[in-house]
């Protein structure tokens, strides 16, 4: 506006260079199982590891378990990069023997995961079953796996026991971490044709879907067999305003990663 008066404040009202905006508050969502049971899930308000999202891959794995209880009932389960931990909670509800739910060792993320475990326990009979079944802990992909294995049998110092089931939900966009993810699978998945790592994901950046799929090349190189076992096209993508092929962004794919017969001999 012409004729404005400069009162000499200059840039006084601008944010200082070292200003850090406040972290968004935690959020919550309700996931309803096919049985009709609601599960309240708390999420951190923001996270550089993307733990503030309830990913479509996690929802689809939860449904996948409920469609056939034998996939988790009585089994030991490890989830990597779990965020809210939805598949782990569903596995515990459906009768898994032991569940270890992990994400990056950020105190806020682990606190939220534990809160979800505690609140889920309050809705399941008998009380105490979920908290006794599910351990929430921090873990960096590719790190020493002994602390994970120790949760299966704390009194066994050999840590030879491994997990029947691994869960990786919407992690493959972390291309630089594929090798570390496979390393952890290799060190924690029971060497048996019956054990399986479930890898469900969407290529949220469609132009990088080949890089997402590169995870399975690394898995094959490390002695695993890979089989696509599920695919679902959703009504809308998780991120509605993102660029790229909309059909790819709405599609969730599920793969089973298993030890080869040769590796099991």
UniProtKB/Swiss-Prot annotation:
Gene3D superfamilies: Vaccinia Virus protein VP39 (3.40.50.150). GO terms for cellular component: cytoplasm. GO terms for molecular function: N-terminal protein N-methyltransferase activity; protein-lysine N-methyltransferase activity. The keyword S-adenosyl-L-methionine applies. It is an enzyme of class 2 (transferase). Disulfide bonds: none annotated. Keywords: Cytoplasm, Methyltransferase, S-adenosyl-L-methionine, Transferase. Pfam families: Methyltransf_16 (PF10294). S-adenosyl-L-methionine binds at residues 55, 81-83, 103, 141, 169. CDD domains: AdoMet_MTases. Its EC number is 2.1.1.-. One of its GO terms (biological process) is methylation. Its main location: cytoplasm. The keyword S-adenosyl-L-methionine applies. S-adenosyl-L-methionine-dependent protein methyltransferase that trimethylates the N-terminal glycine 'Gly-2' of elongation factor 1-alpha, before also catalyzing the mono- and dimethylation of 'Lys-3'. Belongs to the class I-like SAM-binding methyltransferase superfamily. EFM7 family. This is Protein N-terminal and lysine N-methyltransferase EFM7. It comes from Gibberella zeae (strain ATCC MYA-4620 / CBS 123657 / FGSC 9075 / NRRL 31084 / PH-1) (Wheat head blight fungus).
């Amino acid at each position: 506006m012409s004729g404005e008066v400069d009162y000499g404040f200059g840039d006084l009202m601008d944010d200082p260079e070292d200003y850090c905006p406040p972290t968004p508050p935690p959020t919550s969502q309700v996931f309803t199982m096919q049985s009709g049971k609601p599960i309240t899930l708390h999420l951190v308000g923001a996270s550089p590891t993307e733990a503030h999202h309830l990913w479509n891959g996690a929802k689809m794995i939860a449904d996948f378990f409920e469609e056939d209880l034998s996939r988790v009932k009585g089994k030991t389960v490890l989830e990597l990069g779990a965020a809210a931990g939805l598949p782990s909670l569903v596995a515990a509800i459906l009768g898994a023997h032991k569940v270890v739910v992990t994400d990056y060792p950020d105190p806020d993320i682990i606190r939220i995961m534990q809160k979800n475990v505690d609140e889920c326990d309050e809705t399941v009979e008998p009380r105490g079953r979920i908290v006794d079944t599910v351990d929430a802990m921090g873990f960096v992909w590719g790190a020493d796996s002994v602390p994970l294995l120790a949760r299966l049998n704390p009194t066994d110092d050999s840590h030879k026991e491994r997990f029947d089931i691994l869960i990786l939900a919407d992690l493959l966009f972390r291309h630089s971490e594929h090798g570390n993810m496979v390393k952890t699978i290799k060190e924690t998945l029971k060497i048996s044709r019956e054990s399986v790592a479930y890898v469900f994901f969407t290529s949220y950046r469609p132009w990088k879907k080949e890089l997402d799929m590169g995870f399975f090349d690394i898995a094959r190189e490390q002695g695993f067999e890979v089989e696509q076992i599920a695919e679902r096209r959703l009504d809308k993508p998780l991120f509605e305003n993102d660029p790229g092929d909309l059909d790819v962004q709405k599609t969730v794919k599920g793969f089973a990663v298993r030890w080869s017969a040769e590796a099991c001999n």
